[in-house]
Amino acid sequence: MAHCVTLVQLSVSCDHLIDKDIGSKSDPLCVLLQDVGGGNWTELGRTERVQNCSSPEFSKTLQLEYHFETVQKLRFGIYDIDNKTPELGDDDFLGGAECSLGQIVSSRMLTLPLMLKPGKPAGRGTITVSAQELKDNRVVTMEVEARNLDKKDFLGKSDPFLEFFRQGDGKWHLAYRSEVIKNNLNPTWKRFSVPLQHFCGGDASTPIQVRCSDYDSDGSHDLIGTFHTSLAQLQAAPAEFECIHPEKQQKKKSYKNSGTICVKMCQVETEHSFLDYVMGGCQINFTVGVDFTGSNGDPSSPDSLHYLSPTGVNEYLTALWSVGSVVQDYDSDKLFPAFGFGAQVPPDWQVSHEFALNFNPSNPFCAGIQGIVDAYRQALPQVRLFGPTNFAPIINHVARFAAQAANQRNASQYFVLLLLTDGAVTDVEATREAVVRASYLPMSVIIVGVGCADFEAMEQLDADGGPLHTRSGEAAARDIVQFVPYRRFQNAPREALAQTVLAEVPTQLVSYFRAQGWAPFKPPPPAAKGPAQAPQA
């Protein structure tokens, strides 16, 4: 499971802080806290204290891990420091603000009003936070071939492969090993990329040893030859290096080489990360599809999966809140289309597989996750649960919008469809076709199975064992479906479901944009630095 974990640093500044010192301005410091659950907050770090300043820009940054698949609630507190004790209880509180880390990274620069307590602003005070990923995203990309390698196998040609080692601490450390090319003395290896830090420690002059060997299945690989170089020399590609076998060189005066290694291309490139795309302005468009088929049971019966408990929740709503609360931070307008499928809908009571939950087909958008919840609760008594369970219509619906975004040929939009269902999909072939077509578009599909049905068909859509294929044999470009049964998380912490179903989204998003060759889309920075309405964390 590919969780998106990386280190980010936050830069903080404030404007128009209230003055607590008589005859001078305050001496502010910022402290960062993170919600660790159960109403508890833990301190992650503090900035330096800035003397006599009502609009400080703190030079010390605050560092923390970023996890896409969880809501990381943060609290910033600004204090006027008038003593040397580390405790803040004896210092004046100048205001605070709460938000999620997702809101910060998706906004690029987030400005919030400072509050003394809920509903009481700290004058005109504001706090501005920006994020930067602490990661060297540079990679070394190479294309390498060889000519006239020595024959090492008695009954055939050599089976050559390459190994690149970097020098460090007096040792040679393996940085990359190529695939084996069978029975070939003039091989061309696949293009490959290695993180720059791993390849040479970020230093283009670091000695690099390249070994070419003949593969043996018992592990006793035979050396064909070796040479020494550096990234700086490799970047002069196209370049050729003689492959030398040291023992042969010593024994034979007529020995020239054991072949030639040809570096056709060697470049240092930036391999963009998920945060690069998000902070570059990529909007994640979230759409929900809810199963209203008859197998859910009569919503008025406590046995129904659609039955609303006295607290107003059920498995459908719990799953929606879990996933939606994470994804909503990455969509600036917080307007989410929501659909139902498998029900007879008024006024003609025809079965629909993509009806708007708010019954407004021209504007199916709901305001925030709460808006989807409200639309669901209002739609439930107005439809007749029926069938069958068809996924393809909603997948194709979202795919049409994803195709329009793809036609813009930039990394400005990605689509995530959440399907909540209680049973096996009926239109299996049509759904396979829809998923395969969608795999060529900027979108991912998350399926959460509620109830205790047989979800084997869903597991097949989640093609972890290999690419999904249509009946005609067309293969998916990439794996875009993630399926989990809700019951597996029934007794787990609330955030566990979202952590599992969203874990693959960053990788899926990056793989799509990289395949298209699209760098992060960077819209103009916000025009004004005005305070925003404090979002609900």
From Swiss-Prot:
Keyword Translocase attached: no
GO molecular function: calcium-dependent phospholipid binding; metal ion binding
Residues given in the record as Ca(2+) 2 binding sites: D21, D80, D82, D92
Cofactor: Ca(2+)
Any Gene Ontology CC annotation: nucleus
GO biological process: cell differentiation; cellular response to calcium ion; positive regulation of tumor necrosis factor-mediated signaling pathway; regulation of canonical NF-kappaB signal transduction
CDD domains xref list: C2A_Copine, C2B_Copine, vWA_copine_like
Similarity section: Belongs to the copine family.
Keywords: Acetylation, Calcium, Cell membrane, Cytoplasm, Differentiation, Membrane, Metal-binding, Nucleus, Repeat, Repressor, Transcription, Transcription regulation
Name assigned to this protein: Copine-1
Highest rank taxon of the organism: Eukaryota
Entry function: Calcium-dependent phospholipid-binding protein that plays a role in calcium-mediated intracellular processes. Involved in the TNF-alpha receptor signaling pathway in a calcium-dependent manner. Exhibits calcium-dependent phospholipid binding properties. Plays a role in neuronal progenitor cell differentiation; induces neurite outgrowth via a AKT-dependent signaling cascade and calcium-independent manner. May recruit target proteins to the cell membrane in a calcium-dependent manner. May function in membrane trafficking.
Pfam families for this protein: C2, Copine
Residues the record lists as binding Ca(2+) 4: D153, D214, D216, D222
